[in-house]
Amino acid sequence: MGQFPEGVDQELARGDAAFTAGNEGMARVCARRAIGLLIDGLWTPASHAAPWPRDTLHKLRRIHEDEAFPIEVRQAAQRLTTKVTQQDTMPFPTDPLADARLVIRHLMNDTA
């Protein structure tokens, strides 16, 4: 897949630890941070003339809305931006680290 920009591996590791400890909220934060760091440090798609937003949630929303991305990548980005309900539950089953790795894998392959 290639080498990640600085901080991506650390955020994924923190997210894995949080998820294992049952802290899905922190795992989601780490998953999103990892994607943001990757985009900031590496990925500049030739197919996108507009610059990437600075905010990671906006980056994920852009991926979700962009039909140039495969549907599974777009759905993973959507899950990572979906708000947790007041009862701390998601409207669908989720593994934020698996979603992050799916998006990261696609972005890394797109730059190869």
Language model region names:
Residues C30-A31, P96:
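Short, conserved alpha-helical segments within structured domains
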Residues G22-G25, D88-M90:
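Charged, low-complexity interaction regions
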Residues W43-A112:
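Long, charged low-complexity segments
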Residues A27-R28, A34:
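Solenoid-repeat scaffolds in large eukaryotic assemblies
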